[in-house]
Regions:
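Conserved beta-strand scaffold positions in the cores of enzyme catalytic domains, especially
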Residues: 28, 69-73, 145-147, 414, ...
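Bacterial Sec-dependent N-terminal signal peptides
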Residues: 1-23
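Histidine-rich, glycine-flanked metal-binding segment
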Residues: 25-27, 34, 38-80
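C-terminal cap of metal-dependent C-N hydrolases
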Residues: 32, 371, 375, 391-428
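Histidine/acidic-residue-rich catalytic or RNA/ligand-binding cores of hydrolases
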Residues: 94-98, 128, 236-245, 258-264, ...
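Divalent-metal coordination cores built from histidine and acidic residues
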Residues: 74, 78-88, 100-229, 245-246, ...
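His/Asp/Glu-enriched, well-ordered alpha-helical/loop segment
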Residues: 315-400
Length: 429
């Protein structure tokens, strides 16, 4: 048995920072306090044994290990599952703002912050396939990337975002971004989406309830999950839930289950709690349905918060977003953590808003960004929990996140698929 100081295990010098990734055949983490969906209070003095990227054993205390084992004594630090951002956009415009250099920098920052998995909710599938491959085999420092194939009505493909994401191809005619109608060969469209490497079908705009049902039924036959924008102009949120989508995105859009148009008075109301508490209609029936179907709400509070801060006309969006999310949480709806942000802030900020603005406990915010986000991507059998057989996607924290959700940022090291990553501050010249 060899005890290795962490500083000797991990080293790769870079100009501004030192960074490292190291994947031993057998990795042992000792003296950790486990926090995950199955451990609502820290389980102390645990040893985690990782082999070939998977957790193979969890036990109390320390025992004898082979000389080939790399052992890291974490001295009572806190261990959580790797964080999962269930809503990012990394390749909307690969020729512009999402150029490779910028994207690689963002992905690296995400991983070092503790994010080990992301779900990209529509972009250039050609670029995303390459990034996902490189992330998976460790050729880039990045969370694992799972991405969607978008399907929407033809009118949506005049949107300039879709034109940027299909540059060089046919807008609405790409396997990963396709216009569909009642006459579309849905079986072929889904087979093409799977062939593009997508992990799920995202339904976006201008789709009827009948067409949503056709897509979901065929997707089930071909064993690929469906993720929905929560309102599709034709199909209401409850239609998408009834059809069998496993997650729906954007809390404010749930209001369209009760109304076709937002009242003008909402856009002038401002942040006053009395107005919103009195005027927000009940969504209890929808929440009951979502709970029964175990449909996960991808609330995306952060993006609405940022809109409200920069545009007073968007204040209403955030006022209903946080209330709907809070009511859904109180009703037992599963909620994941996705940002839908401009990549300046990560899922840790979404977690903070769930606590400060939607009434979550820090524990439930952690579950949202781990187990529930894994479920939203259809990965909960391999990611999002600390258990035997799960991927070794883990974050070591120096402070207890159950005491303060901001402690989620006290990252000491990150493990993704058994690879150990740590950021070191550069020495002064």
């Amino acid at each position: 048995m060899k005890l290795h100081p962490l500083c000797l295990l991990l080293f790769v010098a870079l100009p501004l920072f030192s960074a490292a990734q190291y994947r031993p055949h057998l990795l042992v983490l000792t003296d950790v306090n486990i926090i995950d969906a199955g451990h609502p209070a820290p389980t102390a003095h645990q040893t985690i044994i990782i082999k070939e990227g998977r957790i193979v054993k969890i036990q109390s205390g320390i025992t004898t290990f082979p000389d080939s084992a790399v052992i890291i004594n974490l001295k009572g630090r806190y261990l959580i599952p790797g964080l999962i951002d269930s809503h990012v956009h990394m390749a909307t415009d690969p020729s512009g703002t999402d150029n490779r250099s910028h994207t690689l920098q963002v992905l690296q920052e995400m991983l070092y912050s503790g994010i080990t998995t992301v779900r990209d909710m529509a972009g250039d599938g050609r670029v995303l396939a390459g990034l996902a491959r490189d992330a998976n085999i460790g050729e880039i420092v990045s969370p694992d990337i799972y991405y969607s194939a978008l399907m929407a009505g033809p009118s949506f493909f005049s949107d300039p975002r879709t034109q940027a994401s299909t540059k060089g191809g046919v807008g609405g005619g790409m396997p990963y971004m396709k216009a569909i109608t009642d006459t579309t060969n849905i079986a072929l469209a889904i087979a093409q989406a799977i062939g593009s490497g997508a992990s799920g079908i995202k339904l976006y705009a201008d789709l009827s309830a009948d067409l949503v049902m056709k897509v979901v039924n065929e997707a089930k036959k071909q064993n690929i999950p469906v993720w929905g924008h929560a309102w599709l102009q034709g199909a209401k949120p409850s239609d998408i839930v009834k059809a069998g989508a496993i997650s729906i995105s954007h809390a404010p859009l749930l209001i369209y289950d009760k109304m076709n148009k937002v009242p003008d008075s909402w856009k002038k109301a401002g942040p006053g709690a009395d107005f919103w508490d009195k005027n927000l209609p009940s969504l209890d029936e929808l929440f009951i349905l979502m709970k029964q179907r175990r449909t996960i709400l991808d609330a995306t509070l952060l993006t609405y918060k940022k809109w409200a801060m920069t545009d007073t006309a968007m204040q209403w969006d955030y006022q209903i977003a946080k209330r709907i999310t809070s009511h859904a949480y109180a009703s037992g709806v599963l909620i994941c953590a996705g940002t839908d942000d401009d990549q300046e802030q990560f899922v840790q900020e979404e977690m903070r808003l769930l606590v400060t603005d939607a009434g979550f406990s820090p524990f439930d915010a952690i579950v949202a960004a781990t187990k529930n986000s894994a479920g939203a991507i259809n990965l909960d059998s391999t990611k999002g929990s600390i258990a035997v057989g799960m991927d070794a996607d883990l974050v070591v924290l120096t402070r207890n996140p159950l005491e303060n959700i901001d402690n989620i940022k006290s990252v000491d090291l990150v493990i993704k698929g058994g690879r150990v990553y740590q950021h070191f501050a550069a020495s002064a010249p």
